[in-house]
Each structure stands twice: as structure tokens, then as C-alpha cells.
Amino acid sequence: LKEEFPLNKLVLFDINKERQEPIGKYGDIMFSERYPELEFAYTTDPKTAYEGMDFIFMQMRAGGLQMRREDEHIPLSMGLIGQETCGAGGMAYGLRSCVDMIEAIHQIRTYSPNAWILNYSNPAAIVAEALRREFPDDKRILNICDQPENVVRSTSRLLGCSWEDLDPV
């Protein structure tokens, strides 16, 4: 993996120190044993996390798991779709996510104005549109969603063929 995907530095950032600490400690052990030349750190400080970075991979859950439960259960209690990326819950989650993502991108651009940002936060379409509107000239923000691949794979199963045989374009 080192030859195929060489890294010099990896920093894990989280706003919740208690949630982050076990992952960070595991990373300390794993990388010191398997990738000792990698500079590894974990932090709750945005400057430490973002300063001088070339690539930033982001995934956040605005409101945490408690709000995910609310986003799913409140619509279900009213006979509506209870899902985190669509329906009433998806819209609530999206609105929360947009605020936090915009703030995070502003922080990143303060410390790493030229970093590539790969965003994998849900709901992908809502967040991507908010970021496009807030940062219309920033061509280094890439929003990623795995749903198109899932649609192709599900369709291939329905058609009884390999997903590689389908051309979605």
C-alpha cells in the first residue's frame, strides 16, 4: 500500500475528543508498527488538522447519532419516510450539515487554501449544492456519493447480468 498510495502525513480531526481518542490511540499503534515513516497525529484543533494539507477527506454527522435517530423516527411516527438522506429527516439533516460543512470549509481555506477537499458527508446532494453556492469558484471541492454505484449494482442483479456489463452513460 505504501508504494501505491504514499503518504507523508495523516491527521485525524474530530470535534469530540472522547470519541476520537480510542481511534487516535489505535492509529498511533498501527502506524508506528506498519508505517513508521508516516507522521501521524490526531487532534481537536482545526489549525493543527488543516494547516499545510494537500488533501482533506471529510465526513461529518451534524447533530451526531442522536439527531440521526430523531431524523428517522419523527417522520416515521407521522407515516412518512424515515431516512437520513431523503424526506423530512433528510432535509433536517441536510440543513444542519450545510451550516457545519460551510464553517469547516472556511476553516480549511484559512489554513490550506489550495488543498483538495473530498467530501463524503450526507445528504450528498443537499450538501454539495450548499457548498457550490457558498464557494462557486472553488474547483478543489469534490463531493462524493456512492449511490450511483449502488443503483448500477442493484440494476445488474435485477437484470441477471454483471454490473461491469452495464454502461450508465
Task: List PLM regions with ranges.
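Glycine-rich phosphate-binding loop and adjoining beta1-alpha1-beta2 segment
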Residues: 2-35
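Conserved short alpha-helix immediately C-terminal to the canonical SAM/SAH-binding motif I
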Residues: 19, 127, 151
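N-terminal Rossmann-like NAD(P) cofactor-binding module of classical short-chain dehydrogenase/reductase
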Residues: 50, 54-60
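Short acidic low-complexity segments
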Residues: 39-52
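Short, surface-exposed basic-aromatic patches at helix termini and helix-loop junctions that form
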Residues: 2-3, 28-33, 110, 129-141, ...
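Residues at the starts of beta-strands that form the adenosine-phosphate
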Residues: 8-9, 39, 116, 140
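Rossmann-fold NAD(P)-binding glycine/threonine-rich loop
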Residues: 62-135
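Substrate/ligand-engaging "lid" and interaction regions
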Residues: 39, 137-140, 144-169
